[in-house]
A protein has these predicted regions:
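A contiguous, basic/glycine-rich beta-loop/short-helix subdomain that forms a polymer-engagement track
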Residues: 180-203, 216-224, 315-358
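Conserved phosphoryl-transfer catalytic core
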Residues: 240, 244-301
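Conserved helicase NTPase motor core
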Residues: 203-210, 214-254, 353-357
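Conserved beta-strand -> loop -> alpha-helix junction used to position metal-binding or nucleic-acid-contacting
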Residues: 102-107, 124-137, 230-242, 254-263
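Walker A/P-loop NTP-binding motif
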Residues: 61, 81-95, 116-118
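Walker A/P-loop
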Residues: 66-87
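Conserved pre-motif I regulatory segment
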Residues: 30-73
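A substrate-engagement module of RecA-like helicase motors
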Residues: 6-10, 14-43, 47, 93-205, ...
Length: 358
């Protein structure tokens, strides 16, 4: 091909230099991390294999070459976690993948995975356990978490003043939750945002299944700089629970009681009556629903009409959302999503009440 040199004028050149200065340290860090991974010594998951474990290792390696999706089933206590982790680490080391995501819906499962990982690789491999916003939350003179995304949008100047480089935050192969909270409190930064900023620098991500299978949470992983699904090994522990977890994540639930609490908070904050009226009526209608019943056609269209009315009001009115509790904001913005579900084809959604008033 032809190589062409294009001169850049001064303003664009300055922008180009700033972007280059931001990218080069990250790319150098990733190269160093991959080189360290290739050279590190990975210990076997078990010093002495028990009956069936050697066969499982062989079968897993063969199956992974033949198919993109592999289902592994073995009795509790068999040693699945260790065998799967060893498979993952060996393939990361060989460059078959450049990242591994390990999902478990149980915190005990995540902690057991971390314990096994440290025993096999010590501090040579960077990993990050992505905890939820509530666990990251702090209430200090410098920063108070709002438990929603507003909390993350801190001034860029605060980050520059703190001189924080995410790749340098790792200690003993990871960035602990308590370290994130300490740094956040000292510098007025959101601990959750600090942990998220470290994701591009970690070789292994450990977290809840929602970080991949929930539309509300998956952006944390999917939108991370440098993430490439085609070069990522995904491991789902306790995968038999996945259908239920996915249904919970994809479903939209509104409680009459929660709506009433939200109504009171919005009324006190001065929300206009034309917005409060359909919100109150929606709460009243939902309160009449009985457990384990599908919605009648009349109820379906009534709820749809109310939800669409509320959605329209949200677009027209002016509310200082920062002045109301985060749960109110989250609940109100759930209504437009419910409107879309109610308006969709019945084949796409089950419209029913799991319990009284829900």
């Amino acid at each position: 091909g032809t190589v062409q040199t294009v001169e850049i004028d001064t303003p664009k050149a300055d922008m180009f230099e700033r972007q280059l200065n931001a990218m080069i340290p990250f790319l150098q860090d990733r190269r160093n991390s991959l080189n360290a991974l290739k050279e590190c010594s990975i210990k076997p998951a078990y010093k002495k294999l028990r009956g069936g474990q050697a066969q499982l290792q062989t079968t897993l390696n063969k199956s992974a070459l033949q198919a993109k999706t592999v289902l592994l089933e073995a009795p509790t206590g068999f040693g699945k976690t260790g065998i799967v982790l060893e498979h993952a680490l060996r393939h990361l080391q060989l460059g078959v993948y450049n990242r591994c995501i390990y999902l478990s819906s149980k915190s005990t499962g995540q902690l057991e995975t971390i314990k096994q990982l440290r025993a096999m690789s010590a501090d040579a491999i960077r990993y990050l356990q992505m905890r939820n916003r509530k666990e990251h939350s702090i209430d200090t003179p410098t920063h108070t978490c709002s438990t929603d995304k507003q909390c993350e949008h801190t001034s860029a100047q605060l980050w520059r003043d703190a001189d924080i480089h995410p790749g340098k935050l790792f200690e003993r192969g990871t960035f602990e939750l308590e370290n994130a909270k300490d740094i956040g409190a000292k510098n007025g930064l959101c601990p959750y945002a600090l942990t998220k900023s470290c994701l591009p620098y970690a070789d292994i991500w450990i977290g809840d299944t929602n970080y991949v299978f929930s539309p509300q949470s998956r952006g944390v992983f999917i939108d991370t700089i440098g993430f490439d699904p085609s070069q990522t090994l995904l491991i789902v522990d306790e995968a038999h629970n996945l259908p239920q977890r996915a249904a919970e994540a994809l479903g939209i639930e509104l409680s009459a009681t929660e709506l009433l609490f939200a109504y009171e908070e919005l009324r006190v904050s001065g929300a206009p009556r034309r917005f409060l009226r359909p919100l109150e009526e929606l709460s009243t209608r939902i309160n009449t629903l009985r457990a384990d019943q599908t919605l009648s056609s009349n109820t379906h269209y009534t709820l749809l009409d109310l939800c669409e009315d509320i959605e329209q009001q949200i677009a027209q009115i002016h509310i200082h959302w920062n002045s109301v509790p985060p749960f109110v904001t989250e609940l109100v913005w759930r209504v437009p999503s419910l409107a879309k579900c109610l308006a969709a084809s019945p084949q796409k959604w089950l419209h029913w009440s799991p319990s009284n008033g829900v």
